[in-house]
Amino acid sequence: MRFWLLLLLGSCLHAQSGENVLLVVNRNVPVSRQIADYYRPRRSVPPKNVCTIDTTGDEEIQWGVYEQQIERPIGDCLKRAGLVEKVLYIVTTMGVPLKVDGPGARDLAEHASVDSELALLYGKLKGQRYPRMGGVRNPFFMRRDSAFQHPAFPIYLVTRLAAYDLADVQAMIDRSLEARNRGKFVIDLQSEKDEPGNDWLRTAAMLLPARRVVLDETTRPLYNQTAVIGYASWGSNDDHRTQRLLHFQWLPGAIAAEFVSTSARTFRRPPDSWAPNTDWADKSRYFAGTPQGLVADLIHEGVTGASGNTYEPYLEACVRPDYLLPAYHQGRNLAESYYLSLPSLSWQSVILGDPLCALKP
C-alpha cells in the first residue's frame, strides 16, 4: 500500500506548473511589476494568473490595509478567474507589503507576515473564519507522504520573490531554473545550546545521504563551504558567529533555514559596515529594529530559497530542517518543502523563492 502511495505522490510532485501559480503585483511599485514581468514567461504563468493590486509600497501596514487592499483583491482575482481550486501557490513580489502590525506578544500577538496570513485565504474563501490572535496550525505540517492538493489541504502555499534589489531577485529566479540534485547539505549546530533546535538539526543530518552531509557540532561556525545545496543553522543567534556573510559557494537551487527571529523584518540593504550580533543592549548596533541577521544576505550571496520571520516566532514555530531538507532532497518543490516543515500559519514566516523550484536528477 505504501509503495502505491509513494508512486502517486511522486507523480504529483512534478505535475505542478505556472498554471498553479497566482502572481501578485503591486501596481504602485515599479520593481514589483519588473519582477512579475521577469518571472511570468520563465514559468509560463498565464496572464489570467497575474493579480494586480493597488496598495502602498510600505513594508509594514495595519490590518485594515491588509484586508481591504491585499486579501480582498487577491480573493477577487481568484474568484473572477475561476482559480480558487486550480491555484496552489501564491507568489508575492517585492513591493507588496511584508508584515502587518498588531498588539500583543507570544500567543496573544496580533502581528503577522502578509504571506503567512495569505496562506489562509483558501479557507476564508470557503467560509472558514480564523482568529487574528496567535498562529493557526498548518494542516500540511509533517505530512511527508501526502500530495499537496485542494481540498485535502485548505490553504495556499505562499512564497515571495524579494531581495535587496531587482538584480538579486532575477538571479534567484535564474538559479531556480537550473536546480540539480547534487552538492552538500551543510548543517551547523551551536554545541552550547541544549535546545530542540539542535535535535532537529541532528535529525536532518540523519535523514539525508551521509556522504552528502557536513555536520558540525563544534563551537566554531562554518564558513567558506563549497558546492552547497542545503543549509541549516542558528544563523546570527549563534554566539560565535562573527561574520555577516558565510562566503559559501551555493549551487543553483540551494535552500537555507536559520533559527533567527526577525531575519525577514526588512528587505532594505544595511550599510556594508553593519554586522549582525547578539548584543540586544546596544541599540547602536541594530538595523531596522533588531541586531539580528537578514535573510536577504543569503539571497545576495547565492541562495535560491530561504525562510525568515518578520517578528518573533519563537523556536517552536520556526521552519523545521528535519522536514525541510529531506523533503527537498527527495523531490518536493520549494514551496511544498518549506510548508511541510512549518508548524504555524497566520504567523511570522516568509518563504523566499520560486515555489516551483525543484531538484532535477
Where are these regions (language model features)?
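Sec-dependent N-terminal signal peptides
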Residues: 3-12
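Cysteine-dependent hydrolase recognition
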Residues: 16-361
